Amino acid sequence: SEMCIRDSVLGKRGKSKNTLLVLTERKTRNEIIFKLPDHTDEAVVAALDRLERKWGADMFKRVFKTITVDNGSEFADAEGLQRSIINEGEKRTKVYYCHPYSSWERGTNEVTNKMIRRKIPKGTNFDDRTEEEVESIENWINGYPRKIHGYHSAGELFEEEVKQLA
């Protein structure tokens, strides 16, 4: 399975320290959304560390074989993104950087960002949003029936994919 870390979604300029990190599974378009304390590479690596602990090292490697990121400074620590927090000295994934200005390489981004913005309008201070609110948005997006999936949700399809990998 291939994962794409997309742009982080920033809160109110100059007001929000917090940001949202959105991971999209390419095949099913399932989203994993993290609220980060700030817009740094350390915060992104810590989010992947949490995800690896949640899934376990072996399952993480199967589900997140590759991760494509843009060239933002929050993704600068390629080594940190790739290294396992569980199995010291091993890689948990392979990171690729997409070409600058090639938004077609991350086409699902705009749709997901619009969906996020329906729940959290542009200019909102993310510092005031709770983890539960972010999780609720993630569940809403993943439960949304999509024409591209024959009106199945990304969440349903992702669950099927994960079962096959187990």
Which residues are covered by each model-predicted region?
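Short, small-residue-biased leader/transition segments that mark boundaries at the very start
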Residues: 2-5
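Mobile genetic element proteins and their domesticated derivatives, centered on retroelements
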Residues: 7, 23, 29, 48, ...
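Short, flexible loop/turn motifs enriched in small residues
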Residues: 13-19
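Active-site beta-loop-alpha junctions of metal-dependent nucleic acid enzymes
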Residues: 16, 33-58
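Short small-residue beta-strand/loop micro-motif enriched in glycine and branched aliphatics
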Residues: 29-34, 122
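Acidic/histidine-rich, metal-coordinating catalytic segments
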Residues: 58-77, 100-101
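Short, surface-exposed basic-aromatic patches at helix termini and helix-loop junctions that form
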Residues: 81-91
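Charged alpha-helix within mobile-element recombinases
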Residues: 92-166
